[in-house]
Amino acid sequence: DETLILVTGDHETGGLGIGYKTTNYDTFLTNLAHQKMSYAKFDSTYVNNYVKNRTPFETAMQDVKANFGLTLPTDPDAANAGKLLLTDHEVENLRTAYERTLKVGSSSQSKMSQQDYELYGTYIPFSMAICHTINHKSGVDHTTYAHTGAMVNLYARGQGADKFRGVYD
């Protein structure tokens, strides 16, 4: 009866927004079911080898299709790709990010152009471009690569819990 348990987070991360301009703010969240792994796992499983072996972009995109569902217009299964069929603009964005990955990889903010930092943060450009693309095709976006100013929940259980429940800045 004397125990009080408090659970909270120190910050919210990512700033998830529902609705995206290129989908007219509609959502297609089932697209996200095609993502089979995190960007970090994709980096360690695939991208590190692409860099080492100088893998051609089209070959890398076969792994992107298998792990994220994003499909090139030239793919034999393009007619079945639905909302995950890439536009020419998206292909060029992915190609640019891929070439930057092979040439430079990730970098600190001080060593990047403002444009590259806004596009990729300090992460591997190709993986970030993949994630941005599937997010945007799904109708979601993230406002930051880091902490946000959003308030966090505080959960409480036990003696005096009613004094601690809520959302706090």
Question: Can you describe what each PLM-predicted range is?
Answer:
Residues D1-D169:
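A post-motif C-terminal structural segment
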